[in-house]
């Protein structure tokens, strides 16, 4: 009873803090001069990380097993992973871009986990025999950490595509408008061109940062995903007598791995970096959600214990 109450308190405290952090981010996005608010939001994410950590530890003690046995627990761990990705580079002082991704991601997963949709699986239950293994922590934690990093990196790539598209569109309109205006505006054209060049330079720098961070984060996530798949194969051989069974979850995890392997391969070609590789990462973003949520909607296969409640199947 005590652990259940403590878990309930920590869940809603962490969700409330993340909600406040998102509000602060929106305010600082509109008013750049409010620096103290941004610092408060960074500290809020750190507090959220420790709250979710306490929640996981509390659930671990109360259930007797590491809390990664169902969808609710994996969502909490996913939210914890987003918070971890946020605070690790915090001390580098140049993570404003990354924080814009990890903050909303944390509140989305935390909000969905604490919503009424998953009420039926909030309570911890006895592990099914297939999950009663030391491989549970290794396999599932690596997979969730991999998903979190890949989702963050993919969202950075999506942002890169949006900014690149807007930049190219404005360049197109500006080049056409410049020919018409040059006959009428005279010296004003030079002033407008200088302003446009400065703005274009800022966007180019932003695109480079997005490309840099998306590659770094996706590389980290790909490493976690690879370890998770390999450890899962070893665990599957011990539990079911086969390293690979082409279960829906396994199949989509393999597809996810292939997509991001293609992304990393495109990065080796200088001509395919930037927008081209970002397109592949954006496709990977959709594939991850199919693998993580879409397969759970089916509730079939060897991984059906991680599906939605029976009322949704």
UniProtKB/Swiss-Prot annotation:
GO cellular component: chloroplast thylakoid membrane; plasma membrane
Superkingdom field: Eukaryota
InterPro entries: Cyt_c_assembly (IPR002541), Cyt_c_biogenesis_CcsA (IPR017562), Cyt_c_biogenesis_CcsA/CcmC (IPR045062)
GO BP of this protein: cytochrome complex assembly
Intracellular or extracellular location(s): Plastid, Chloroplast thylakoid membrane
Signal peptide boundaries: none
UniProt entry keywords in alphabetical sequence: Chloroplast, Cytochrome c-type biogenesis, Membrane, Plastid, Thylakoid, Transmembrane, Transmembrane helix
TM region(s), chain numbering: 9-29, 44-64, 71-91, 111-131, 143-163, 217-237, 244-264, 278-298
Major subcellular site: plastid
A GO MF label: heme binding
Membrane association type: Multi-pass membrane protein
Key word Iron present: no
Annotated function: Required during biogenesis of c-type cytochromes (cytochrome c6 and cytochrome f) at the step of heme attachment.
NCBIfam families on file: cytochr_II_ccsB (TIGR03144)
PANTHER family (UniProt xref): CYTOCHROME B_B6 PROTEIN-RELATED, HEME EXPORTER PROTEIN C
Subunit structure of this chain's protein: May interact with Ccs1.
Family: Belongs to the CcmF/CycK/Ccl1/NrfE/CcsA family.
Name assigned to this protein: Cytochrome c biogenesis protein CcsA
Organism: Nicotiana sylvestris
Taxonomic lineage: Eukaryota, Viridiplantae, Streptophyta, Embryophyta, Tracheophyta
GN (gene name): ccsA
């Amino acid at each position: 009873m005590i652990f259940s109450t403590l878990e309930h308190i920590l869940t809603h405290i962490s969700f409330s803090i993340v909600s406040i952090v998102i509000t602060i981010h929106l305010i600082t996005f509109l008013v750049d001069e409010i620096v103290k608010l941004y610092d408060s939001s960074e500290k809020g994410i750190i507090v959220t990380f420790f709250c979710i950590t306490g929640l996981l530890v509390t659930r671990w003690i109360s259930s007797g097993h590491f809390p990664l046995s169902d969808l609710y627990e994996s969502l909490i761990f996913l939210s914890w992973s987003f918070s971890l990705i946020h605070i690790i580079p915090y001390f580098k002082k140049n993570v404003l871009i990354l924080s814009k991704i990890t903050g909303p991601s944390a509140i989305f997963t935390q909000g969905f986990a604490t919503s009424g949709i998953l009420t039926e699986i909030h309570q911890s239950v006895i592990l099914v025999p297939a999950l009663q293994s030391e491989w549970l922590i290794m396999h599932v934690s690596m997979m969730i950490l991999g998903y979190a990093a890949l989702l963050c990196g993919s969202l950075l790539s999506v942002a890169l595509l949006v900014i690149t598209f807007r930049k190219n569109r404005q360049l197109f309109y500006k080049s056409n408008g410049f020919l018409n205006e040059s006959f009428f505006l005279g010296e004003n054209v030079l002033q407008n061109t200088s302003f446009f060049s400065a703005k274009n330079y800022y966007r180019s720098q932003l695109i480079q940062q997005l490309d840099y961070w998306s590659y770094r984060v996706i590389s980290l996530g790909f490493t976690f995903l690879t370890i998770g798949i390999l450890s899962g194969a070893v665990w599957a051989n011990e539990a079911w007598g086969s390293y690979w069974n082409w279960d829906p979850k396994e199949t989509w995890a393999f597809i996810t791995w292939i997509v991001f392997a293609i992304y990393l391969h495109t990065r080796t070609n200088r001509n395919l970096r930037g927008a081209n590789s970002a397109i592949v990462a954006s496709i990977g973003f959709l594939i991850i959600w199919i693998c993580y949520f879409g397969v759970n909607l089916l509730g079939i296969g060897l991984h059906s214990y991680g599906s939605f409640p029976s009322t949704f199947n």
